[in-house]
Amino acid sequence: MSFEITILGSSGGPLEGSTCSILLKPANISYHDIINDNLPDQVLCIDAGSGMGKLTEIIHQETTTKTSYCNFLQYYPDCETVSYYYHPNVTITTPFSNFQPGRPILHTQNIFNNLQNYLISHSHLDHVCSVVINSAGFNKNMSNKILYGSHYTINAMQQHLFNGKVWPNMPSFKIVNLNYLESNRSERIGIYTVKMFDLSHGEFNKLTEDKEDAQHHSNSNSNSNNIWGKRYDRRRSSITTIPQNTSGLIIKNSEALNHHYLSSAFLITLEVPCTTKEPPPSILVFGDFESDLTSKLSRNLFIWKSIASLILRNQLKAIVLECSNCKEIAANELYGHLTPKLLIYELKQLEHECKQLDTATTSTEQPLLGLNVIVNHVKEPIADPNQESQLHDPRKRILAELNKLNEIEKLGCNISIALSGTSIIV
């Protein structure tokens, strides 16, 4: 059995409108079936940077042209066609092409009326903004929306988004429900079993300032013991302040102890009927995260150890993970993200764990051979006014670099770049 993924958004910003969100369902169930048979348990939405607006665009495009389309491929002079960015073993689909043309908003509403469950990796705006805005159009009589995430993520959404100030308190109106997931425990959600893992997405405090800013602090606080001007070499963080827990909500996650911003990965397993002889397929979807090399933690290693057996049994259909930067940059400029070399480093750790688990594997074998690696959260480049001619497609550059490193390291992975607006089967 396979999964069909519709990539509502895969951008890492700063352009809004196509940030990270995917719809996931079994490949053998169509959206027509889900709508006509009222099957909300079949669909998962992982992260919510994009939502109803983007799906409406996708449906309009597919019903009009019968083709897969990504608007970002019009933004750079060196962009290729959609198929260039996906490995040949990944099937590109158009699941909405047979919908009635001219009614994309209606079709979007019908799909969202049959979407119940969201998995939210972390509460940064580029991963949650659409579910906040879309909540004004949710029909609670059709399917009650449930948002699942870590204690820290769910608390942040209640305190800082659905707080009656930034946005109406939708949980109090029963428009959405906020549910905790516990790390490293499996929970049944619809027809899936979901296991959440902790990730590090940078540190809470900004530990580095530009030298001009540091000099300003030094001059304006000459009599104080100012730390900012002394730490140019410390890496920068995902966010710049330590969040306050002032409303009595329980924080159970380890980020409060080690000052690392908590993100999440989700291992999603499709629970097939017991009459089926096939083993249940799984897919691993990451939120934003940094390498263990950067964090000096072992959170990613724990995940690799946990999924190695799935790879050896050919049950893991794909890994969806970020690579925000198209070039190698200093650790203090990563902001809790990956580069191509750091991504390949993490895949090498996964390969090592597979070899450790399978004692029959020799050093010449490739346990990751044929593994689908789908890369998202690519950031659009910010051009210096004097270097406008160097503004090129970052997805193309990342794909080329990853394929080169994949070959050098003899990993054998099938690497693709997720394109907003497209659908694939893995």
UniProtKB/Swiss-Prot annotation:
Superkingdom of this protein's organism: Eukaryota
Entry annotated with the keyword Lyase: no
Coiled coil (residue ranges): none
Region (Disordered): 210-229
A Pfam family hit: PDEase_II
PROSITE patterns: PDEASE_II (PS00607)
Alphabetical keyword list: cAMP, Hydrolase
Enzyme Commission number(s): 3.1.4.17
GO molecular function: 3',5'-cyclic-AMP phosphodiesterase activity; 3',5'-cyclic-GMP phosphodiesterase activity
InterPro entries: cAMP-PdiesteraseII_CS (IPR024225), Pdiesterase2 (IPR000396), RibonucZ/Hydroxyglut_hydro (IPR036866)
Family of the protein in this entry: Belongs to the cyclic nucleotide phosphodiesterase class-II family.
Name of the protein described by the UniProt record: 3',5'-cyclic-nucleotide phosphodiesterase
The organism of origin for this protein: Candida albicans (Yeast)
Gene name of the encoded protein: PDE1
